[in-house]
């Protein structure tokens, strides 16, 4: 698992660098042409027509959220989030880690209603990237810190799901929502019947995803909802727990293909026309400061206060310095921040999109470098 996290993190970095190379070379025309390549799926009168970029953001990312949902369900029902005492510190930390960056972003953009739509961009944490950096530079650290980072990221993902549902959905289609609701009821029935094949769940899940896509609610939410109806303990035809089997099957696809591909199609920003105005734009600065300062400030201050008030305990075997390094890693928003940015500024002008991408790249990079330095040097200070 640690090897997969490390390799996945390296692939994310490589995909992002490749995207920047494509976007800033003679290949930029080809790159943009591929992103805007129209793809159509039609069955009778039902049709989904989207460019490749949106198939990745709406389709492949739904599989990512399916895996997140499976992980959350397992951890909440029988993992290290099943005990209330284990939930307090990461739960409070994640709440502050969402609120502080959002407030900082809003303070930079409060005079621009359009820019304010991006308030949630610096509130996200890229769980794959953060764990990848931790696996590279925190191998000597106690496992409790990794569990803390994972727990914070899980709560962060739940917050992202709620934010997307409440603030980044469009006009709703009653008929599509009804179809999605019927599909969810069918998933519940399949769960209660203890069906041992995963294929019926996936077929109904595909219908739910398509209905949610057409409903105006963001389609990625379907993946998270579907996950909660996959049986936790019922065994499949291979005599393995169905949820765990599906989670393990999805993990390499997410780590080695979905997230790197998402990074490749979303991280490419043309740097040629970018000047000081773009770098110092309120949107860019709000995201950079939100990710790099807001995340670490929110999470670490709430952890310090909770531990000093004896509401929670410092992760077992960890020092304050090591905890601070992990708090820095939570500022790696990368793919999740880019994803929320694509929702917040869908159809926006190229300057706004460039500001979002630059802010996310710089904020995430600062958090990753500083977090890695703190974690690496912590072994020398002990």
UniProtKB/Swiss-Prot annotation:
Subcellular location: Cell inner membrane
Transmembrane segments: 7-27, 28-48, 52-72, 88-108, 118-138, 147-167, 170-190, 206-226, 254-274, 285-305, 325-345, 356-376
GO terms classed as biological process: regulation of pH
Its membrane topology: Multi-pass membrane protein
Annotated GO CC locations: plasma membrane
InterPro entries tied to this protein: Na/H_antiporter_dom_sf, NhaA
Gene Ontology MF terms: sodium:proton antiporter activity
A Pfam family it matches: Na_H_antiport_1
Catalytic reactions on record: Na(+)(in) + 2 H(+)(out) = Na(+)(out) + 2 H(+)(in)
Keyword terms, alphabetized: Antiport, Cell inner membrane, Cell membrane, Ion transport, Membrane, Sodium, Sodium transport, Transmembrane, Transmembrane helix, Transport
Primary location recorded for the protein, binned into one broad class: membrane
Taxonomy, superkingdom: Bacteria
PANTHER family in alphabetical order: NA(+)_H(+) ANTIPORTER NHAA, SODIUM ION/PROTON ANTIPORTER NHAA-RELATED
Family classification: Belongs to the NhaA Na(+)/H(+) (TC 2.A.33) antiporter family.
Role noted for this protein: Na(+)/H(+) antiporter that extrudes sodium in exchange for external protons.
Name of the molecule in the record: Na(+)/H(+) antiporter NhaA 2
Lineage, top ranks: Bacteria, Pseudomonadati, Pseudomonadota, Gammaproteobacteria, Cellvibrionales
Gene that this polypeptide is encoded by: nhaA2
């Amino acid at each position: 698992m640690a090897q997969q996290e490390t390799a996945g993190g390296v692939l994310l970095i490589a995909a992002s660098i490749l995207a920047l190379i494509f976007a800033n070379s003679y290949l930029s025309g080809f790159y943009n042409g591929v992103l805007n390549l129209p793809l159509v799926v039609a069955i009778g009168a039902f049709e989904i027509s989207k460019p490749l970029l949106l198939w990745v953001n709406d389709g492949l990312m739904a599989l990512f959220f399916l895996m997140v949902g499976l992980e959350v369900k397992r951890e909440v029902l029988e993992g290290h989030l099943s005990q209330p005492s284990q939930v307090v510190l990461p739960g409070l930390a994640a709440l502050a880690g969402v609120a502080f960056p959002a407030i900082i972003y809003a303070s930079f953009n409060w005079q621009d209603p359009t820019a304010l739509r991006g308030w949630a961009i610096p509130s996200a944490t890229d769980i794959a990237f953060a764990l990848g950096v931790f696996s590279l530079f925190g191998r000597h650290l106690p496992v409790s810190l990794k569990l803390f980072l994972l727990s914070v990221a899980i709560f962060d993902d739940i917050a992202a799901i709620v934010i997307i549902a409440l603030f980044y959905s469009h006009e709703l289609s009653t008929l599509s929502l009804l179809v999605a609701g019927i599909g969810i009821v069918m998933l519940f029935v399949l769960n209660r019947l203890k069906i041992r094949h995963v294929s019926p769940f996936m077929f109904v899940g595909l219908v739910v995803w398509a209905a949610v896509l057409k409903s105006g609610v963001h389609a990625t939410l379907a993946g998270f909802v579907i996950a909660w109806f996959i049986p936790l303990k019922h065994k499949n035809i291979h005599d393995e727990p169905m949820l765990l089997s599906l989670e393990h099957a999805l993990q390499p696809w997410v780590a080695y293909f979905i997230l790197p591909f998402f990074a490749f199609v979303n991280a490419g920003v043309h740097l040629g026309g970018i000047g000081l105005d773009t770098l110092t734009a309120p949107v860019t600065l709000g995201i950079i400061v939100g990710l790099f300062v807001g995340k670490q400030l929110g999470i670490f201050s709430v952890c310090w206060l909770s531990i000093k008030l004896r509401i929670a305990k410092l992760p077992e075997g960890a020092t304050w310095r090591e905890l601070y390094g992990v708090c820095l890693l939570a500022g790696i928003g990368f793919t999740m921040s880019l994803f929320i940015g694509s929702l917040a500024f869908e159809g926006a002008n190229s300057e706004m999109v460039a500001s979002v991408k630059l802010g996310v790249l710089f904020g995430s990079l600062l958090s990753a470098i500083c977090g890695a330095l703190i974690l690496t040097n912590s072994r020398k200070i002990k």
